[in-house]
């Protein structure tokens, strides 16, 4: 029923719990890890965890697109390598995919960080508002949609960054559904760079995108 598609690049540190969280579900037909040229053994590690590995050129848009092309199921779920779905996620997915008209809608999970820092709680609220009001859930919230909808909107663009924003804008806010489940994402990048600085940079990158800057340029700024 469901293909899980995970883009990776040197992801051995956090990949095991991500795959473990979805592997046991009866809904999952396959787990595809689309690797962009890791040098840390990610490809071999993913295989040992039960995933089917596809080698791609680096770039998340490219990797997600390759994953969708190689997936065999009628439902696709795109998930970041450092994002872990909390128990109960499969119940919310089952309820979504069996609902009338679900094939023309896409679902995403509630964003949560694995950090007790008060900044993390504030950011989670900000993401919830961005998702609900603006209709802009990011890739670290997961994205669930039917193969037919994926094809109808043109699939993921093969761009290095903002592929998630580009995709959900084409799906349309009225067709996005908040699932009753939580996606817990690593807070490492916020801890390393500082919450405030990373949030400012994320907002700046989003602004650049809406102003028409190229994804390649935005990717350089994001780093």
Please give the residue ranges for each predicted region.
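Hydrophobic helical membrane-anchoring modules
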Residues: 169-223
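A conserved acidic beta->alpha catalytic loop
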Residues: 35-43, 83
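Short aromatic/hydrophobic "clamp" motif used to bind/position activated sugar donors
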Residues: 76
């Amino acid at each position: 029923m469901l293909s899980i598609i995970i883009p990776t690049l040197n992801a051995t540190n956090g990949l095991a719990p991500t795959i473990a969280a979805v592997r046991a579900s009866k809904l999952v037909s396959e787990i595809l890890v689309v690797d962009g040229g890791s040098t840390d053994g990610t490809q071999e590690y993913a295989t040992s965890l039960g995933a089917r590995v596809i080698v791609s050129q680096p770039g998340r848009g490219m990797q997600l697109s390759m994953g969708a092309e190689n997936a065999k199921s009628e439902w696709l779920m795109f998930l970041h390598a450092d994002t872990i779905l909390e128990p109960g996620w499969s119940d919310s997915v089952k309820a979504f995919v069996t609902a009338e008209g679900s094939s023309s809608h896409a679902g995403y999970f509630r964003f949560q960080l694995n950090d007790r820092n008060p900044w993390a709680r504030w950011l989670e609220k900000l993401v919830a508002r961005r998702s609900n009001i603006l209709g802009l859930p990011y890739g670290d919230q997961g994205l669930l949609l039917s193969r037919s909808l994926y094809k109808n909107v043109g699939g993921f663009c093969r761009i290095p960054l903002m592929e998630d924003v580009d995709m959900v804008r084409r799906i349309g806010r009225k067709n996005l559904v908040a699932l009753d489940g939580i996606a817990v994402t690593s807070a490492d990048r916020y801890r390393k760079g500082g919450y405030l600085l990373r949030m400012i940079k994320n907002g700046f990158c989003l602004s650049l995108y809406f102003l028409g800057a190229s994804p390649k340029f935005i990717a350089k700024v994001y780093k």
